[in-house]
Curated annotation (Swiss-Prot):
Enzyme Commission identifier(s): 5.4.2.12
GO molecular function annotations of the record: metal ion binding; phosphoglycerate mutase activity
A GO BP annotation: glycolytic process
Pathway linked to the protein: Carbohydrate degradation; glycolysis; pyruvate from D-glyceraldehyde 3-phosphate: step 3/5
Family matches, as InterPro entries: Alkaline_phosphatase_core_sf (IPR017850), ApgAM_prokaryotes (IPR023665), Metalloenzyme (IPR006124), Pglycerate_mutase_ApgM (IPR004456)
The UniProt record lists the keyword DNA damage: no
Name used for this protein in its record: Probable 2,3-bisphosphoglycerate-independent phosphoglycerate mutase
Keywords of this entry: Glycolysis, Isomerase
Role according to the record: Catalyzes the interconversion of 2-phosphoglycerate and 3-phosphoglycerate.
Amino acid sequence: MKYIVLLGDGMSDEPMQELGGKTPLQAARTPHMDAMARRGRIGLARTVPEGYPPGSDVANLSVFGYDPRACYTGRSPLEAASMGVELGSADVAFRVNLVNLAPTRGTLVMNDYSAGHISTAEGRELIEAIQGVMGTDEFQFYPGVGYRHLMVWRNGKCGMTVVPPHDISGQSILEHLPKGEGAERLIELMNSSQLVLNNHPQYRRRLEEGKVPANSIWLWGHGKAPRMASFHEKFGLTGAVISAVDLVRGIGVCAGLDVIKVEGATGYIDTNYEGKVTAALEALEAHDYVYLHVEAPDEAGHGGNLEHKLKAIEDFDARVVGPIMAGMEKFGSYRILCTPDHPTPLRLKTHTDAPVPFVLFSGETSENAGVAGYDEESARSAGLVVEDGFRLMEMMLDR
């Protein structure tokens, strides 16, 4: 038996007036996901436990089959694992976003949480400049992918409250600055970064090219190294993870899965879908399980871009789900779990903890009478609700 998870990050949403009361999943053309829903088991899963932030970290841990209440320590330690950055027991990792802040009516607002979806090469250039000026034995900066980078505070503080920048798009940053023990050190670093970035040659170059420049860092998502059982210990399977996002790769590292990096995987609508599909099917020749993650719908949700979200969903269906369904046939016995991790509603431009629609499919499953297709309402109407999202993995394995 071969198993594959197809994860459309942030794919679920709310009914929208612009779509005649439909959600993007209902409005998008998704014949392959619809076919799975009509022949498989469809329902809703609550991937974010009550009281936990509805982040991709918590939600993806659930879909991997891990109870976040038992192993979640924060987002950035997972990203550090993906990047090969070792954390001592007293070290605290932070996500570093390259952002654009804009003066508006006497305050600074979060204009763009991704600095115009800055490229990986440009992001590396800036983080290396920041490390050169601001890096010390205590604070160290590591380049990642696109706008997503890492800082480690050696023997650092961990009790402060921080806010994800994508949660405050268009809002003043003043009421959202870090608070609590150690917060003043983080604010100092963010302020110092503005001097480095505003004086970097890249700032003027991006302005001249009509692009949004990075003019600050934003620190968030902190935590210490987690303790997790390996995927093989937990489920008795070998596996691999395919994603452009360090967070998801990091969960794979902590779970002892192979992390497969695909050239051209960007975490955006221009990602290399075909390369991911090829890598997934090749990995299943050697492994029992693959987790194939696509970030594009989530990025469209954060940007509030309906056109991009519809395109991301349709590309996910046509360029990932369809080819995977066809490619799995050669294995004979297989199961596919297709799901978002959490909703990222266009109206809110951030995540919610609402249950997500999932479909569990195998080539042997029979017709589902009355199921219209794969979307939030069809999943709700089916009446199946998995209250503990981490049990989706047990359902997939029939345990």
